[in-house]
Design a protein with these regions (language model features):
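Intrinsically disordered terminal extensions that flank WD40 beta-propeller domains
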Residues: 1-83
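Per-blade loop-tip surfaces of WD-repeat and WD-like beta-propellers in eukaryotic adaptors/scaffolds
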Residues: 68-78, 113-135, 139-143, 153-177, ...
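Beta-strand-rich domains and repeat architectures in extracellular enzymes and scaffolds
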Residues: 83-107
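Loop/turn segments within WD40 beta-propeller blades
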Residues: 93-99, 136-142, 148, 179-185, ...
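Conserved strand-to-loop turn within each blade of WD40 beta-propeller repeats
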Residues: 104-108, 147-151, 190-194, 225, ...
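Loop/turn-rich, solvent-exposed surfaces of beta-rich toroidal or solenoidal domains
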Residues: 303-332
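Blade-level signature of beta-propeller repeat domains, shared across WD40, Kelch, NHL, RCC1
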Residues: 355-378
Length: 378
């Protein structure tokens, strides 16, 4: 169900509150044979003339699987892992900074916590929002998880216990986006359909500053030193707000439609943006950069009439970028050549978020088909 702005209104009724037992983790292991289902003295060898790409031989005595095919590049149980359990569209997903777990959420208002390795079990469900969850972020050390919701609040969760430790209230409409500061006091910035960007200190009650924007704000992030907030929205501009002067210091122009995702590179020099004009751009946000800050434009991914907030992300080393796309594909580009490295199929709905694992060659995607995929890349 979408509101007039193209984003979901809050789901109503108990149908959107599945119990823990209703949530079933479904995992598809690509082309694998389970030796446990065979007699103990049997060895299994493909007998078809046309053999599969990956030939799997089950050695019964050692109870191990040996894969004959392309070399593995990650510690995932299989090259592709599928996780099901959400009752509605998945809008957001993030790896924990330690890489061992991940969180996902969306229209069903539930935050599901998953193991990355092994069987990828859904080991916890966090409840508390009364509206769709639009964005999730862990803080730098992974101790807290932040969630922005259409219930006009931002949840602050203890990622170890799953307890909600704070509820940030002050916005008067949907909160589309949130982002915690990388360093210093635990600040978080938020953006809303009420046309404001707010700055919060989780130790204090209420926002510590509000920046007034003219139009709805769809994406926010901090700069690397956490003394500036960058915001994008339906006015097609990226605005940079200075927290020491409490004012707008410059605006970056170039996109021809709403900006739905922002992501800062790990070293803090470049900003990535995803827009409904069907381009992804890299901007130089270093001090004293040239006035024309847009340094690269990437094409391939698509937005459509659904107007979902499609996000974007950097790999940890900055060599790759990824973006969500309404055409059901995961797009990954090389940042140097601007070439599409991967256009990954699998989802049956708009891919709303794609993120890179903090340590391994793994990408995670969440989509409107209610599913999450993890896959290893080269």
């Amino acid at each position: 169900m979408l509101n007039s702005g193209g984003r979901p209104s809050s789901p109503e009724g108990s149908a959107f509150e599945p119990t823990r037992s209703d949530i079933v983790t479904q995992i598809k292991l690509a082309s694998m044979i389970d030796p446990k289902k065979r007699a103990a003295d049997m060895a299994i060898v493909p007998t078809a003339v046309k053999r599969p790409r990956n030939e799997l031989v089950a050695a019964a005595q050692s109870q191990q699987l040996m894969a004959m095919g392309p070399p593995r590049t990650s510690s995932l149980q299989a090259p592709i892992m599928l996780m099901s359990g959400h009752e509605g569209e998945v809008y957001c997903c993030k790896f924990h900074p330690n890489g061992a777990t991940l969180a996902s959420s969306g229209f069903d208002r539930l935050i599901l916590m998953w193991n990355v390795y092994g069987d990828c079990e859904n080991y916890a469900t966090l409840k508390g929002h009364s509206g769709a969850v639009m964005e999730l972020h862990y803080n730098t050390d992974g101790s807290m998880l932040f969630s922005a919701s259409t219930d006009k609040t931002v949840g602050v969760w203890d990622s170890e216990t799953g307890e909600r430790i704070k509820r940030l209230k002050g916005h008067t409409s949907f909160v589309n986006t949130c982002y915690p500061a990388r360093r210093g006091p635990q600040l978080v910035c938020t953006g809303s359909d009420d046309g404001t960007v707010k700055l919060w200190d989780v130790r204090k009650k209420g926002a510590i500053h509000t920046f007034q924007n003219t139009y709805q704000v769809l994406a926010v992030t901090f700069n690397d030193t956490s003394d500036q907030i960058m915001s994008g929205g339906i006015d097609n501009e990226i605005k940079v707000w200075d927290l020491r002067q409490n004012k707008l210091i410059y605006t970056m122009h170039g996109h021809g439609d709403s900006i739905t995702g922002l992501s800062l590179s790990s070293e803090g020099s470049y900003l990535l943006s995803n827009s409904m004009d069907n381009t992804v751009r890299i901007w130089d946000v270093r001090p004293f950069a040239p006035k024309e800050r847009c340094v690269k434009i990437f094409q391939g991914n698509l937005h459509n009439f659904e107007k979902n907030l499609l996000r974007c992300s950097w790999s940890n080393d900055g060599s790759k970028i990824a973006a969500g796309s309404a055409d059901r594909f995961v797009y990954i580009w090389d940042t140097t050549s601007r070439r599409i490295l991967y256009k990954l199929p699998g989802h049956a709905g708009s891919v709303n978020e794609v993120v890179f694992h903090p340590e391994e060659s793994i990408v995670l995607s969440g989509a409107s088909d209610k599913r999450l995929y993890m896959g290893e890349i080269q």
